[in-house]
Amino acid sequence: MNWMHGLALLLAAALPSAAVADDAAPLAHPTLLSSPKQARIGEQRLRYRVSFDQLDLIGADGEPAASISAIGYMAERADTDTRPVLFAFNGGPGASSVLQVEGLGPLLRVRNGTRQTLVANPHSILDAADLVFLDPPGTGFSRAPADAAARARYWSDHGDAKAVAAMIRHWLKIHGRERAPLYIAGESYGGYRLALLAADIGDLRPAGVLLVSPLLDATSSDDSAGNDLRAVFDLPSLIVAAAAHGKGELAGQPVEQVYAQARAFALGDYAQALLQGSALPADARNRMAARLAALLGLPPQALLAADLRPDVETFRLGVLAADGQQIGRLDSRIVAPLPTPHADDNGRPSAANDPALGLGRSNRINSAVMADYLHGLFGAGLPQDYVSLDIDIAMAWRFAADDGAGPRPVGSAMRFNPTPNLARLAQANPRFRVLALNGYYDLAVPALGPWYALHHSGVDPARIDFRILPGGHAVFAEEALRPQLHTLLKDFLK
């Protein structure tokens, strides 16, 4: 399950940045290797093995302070120099790499009521590439940082990216894949992580990156006064959500048409109005409020009170409030009763009550089905619990900008953008490509934000394949999309 970038940014805004010291070399555990397995993908039968690798990350005292792990799926009897390797991770921060069982890997996690099982995935991309899923410190079976100093180092944007880069290098080396075509996938905050670590892996010459509902330019989610881009980027996805629930004048139209009209309005009349700020005349302000009300199904007075800049959380709690309902943030098609305030919320953000997330009152989700699966593959030497999601990690996360002089805090919020690092990878490899997959119904990372970041990154637009699909934040969780996604990825990995 994925965690949303908006919560991480919200929680981290008040936290000081911690400097990340030069890392001592991580300590590697021996590779664990499963017995041969078999998958059927389309008409192809494929034999593969599963590996588990772990690196101990070193603290300031020179002792192991945390760990990062990798679960690999490797086809047997393949040419290891020509067969691609795709590394993948989810986001959070605090999410394990559930892309492993949510569309990419040879097994799928399915739910039958409250019970979860793993079944064969006929649309796995294992037929085109070996797959390696990374679990950062505190997720999956990876050990959480042992003390405050280690948390400051490894639960930070730069420390986390360096740990992931170290694991990628380690895995390629010990598995003899340093000459293989390299691809990297990041979902949600994983997109931000990927753009950060791109600065450190140019020598590996990646052939491409897969970005799934990616946070990239933090401006797209920053609510700081004067940042109108956030409101412009959010609006098309808000209008799509309204239409999906029969609200607004675009209700009933195909989602592609709704989004196209909403995007044109957001980048046109709406952006022009917001850019005028307080100089926008009162009559023009009232007309814009009325136009927004017609598109969103909200009262004009509410939009005037929001200074014409509705935010995702207020919208998703308000658009169906008359019916006592909220809509999802990770998937705006989902509807649930409005949350009941609890005395023990302790500042817990409203986004943690997203019905599409499924946290309930807990901050942590352990995956019994993943723990049982991996224990069955590798024996009892692994930890008991597999941590699927821990939002306490997001609450402890530290963000910084790196201007070459080392990490430092950025004003009162996070308005920084590592996406231009991808242009460096493109310059190093003329075959480098970007595939970006986004969901129409994603309110955690509205699709216009990643589009803007990528088309201001310096990457040649001819190398960018940007798709918006009829899904939510977890694009690969959409069963109906998996055949199309498999075809897209096979072409991307050629």
Residue ranges, per PLM feature:
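C-terminal subdomain of alpha/beta-hydrolase-fold enzymes, centered on the catalytic histidine
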Residues: 217-230, 298-494
